[in-house]
């Protein structure tokens, strides 16, 4: 039961991160830039969630099958890549940042696929 709650919590946190990343990418494409504070806040949240995913996936190791394990690692990778991407883009202006929206979109796609895989696996377990 405890393991199921941890899985659900991780899945919900990943979904929230995906929503945040999708909103950021959409705004970045519309404006052409983002504020440094927005980027730093999102980056810090992604690094924190990445660390939590890593720690919790190690604790859940005995309760995860290969597909779940792989999906969690792909999600970790997508979050880390997005966070690193958010560190780039500082140019002449200290208050705005122009990160690579294409890289962030790739991270968003990878994160979405990982979440879908985890959701599919959760539905199969309930059945």
Swiss-Prot record:
Query: What's a GO biological-process term for it?
Result: regulation of gene expression
**A Pfam family matched in the record:** YliH
Task: List each coiled-coil range.
Answer: none
What does the UniProt entry report for the null mutant? Cells show increased biofilm formation when glucose is present in the medium. In a continuous-flow system with M9C medium supplemented with glucose, the biofilm had a 290-fold greater biomass, a 2700-fold greater thickness and a 31-fold increased surface coverage than the wild-type.
Which superkingdom is the protein from? Bacteria
User: Which InterPro entries would you find in this protein's record?
Assistant: Biofilm_regulator_BssR
Entry's NCBIfam families?
PRK12302.1
Function according to Swiss-Prot or TrEMBL: Represses biofilm formation in M9C glu and LB glu media but not in M9C and LB media. Seems to act as a global regulator of several genes involved in catabolite repression and stress response and regulation of the uptake and export of signaling pathways. Could be involved the regulation of indole as well as uptake and export of AI-2 through a cAMP-dependent pathway.
Name of the protein in its database record: Biofilm regulator BssR
Tell me what organism the protein belongs to: Escherichia coli (strain K12)
* Gene behind the chain: bssR
């Amino acid at each position: 039961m405890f393991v199921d709650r941890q899985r659900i919590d991780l899945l919900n946190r990943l979904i929230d991160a995906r929503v945040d990343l999708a909103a950021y990418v959409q705004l970045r494409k519309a404006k052409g830039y983002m504020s440094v504070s927005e980027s730093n806040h999102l980056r810090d949240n992604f690094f924190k969630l990445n660390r939590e995913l890593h720690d919790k996936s190690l604790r859940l190791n005995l309760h995860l099958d290969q597909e779940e394990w792989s999906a969690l690692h792909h999600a970790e990778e997508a979050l880390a890549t997005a966070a690193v991407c958010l560190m780039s883009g500082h140019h002449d202006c200290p208050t705005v940042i122009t990160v690579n929206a294409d890289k962030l979109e790739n991270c968003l796609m990878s994160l979405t696929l990982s979440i879908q895989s985890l959701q599919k696996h959760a539905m199969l377990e309930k059945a």
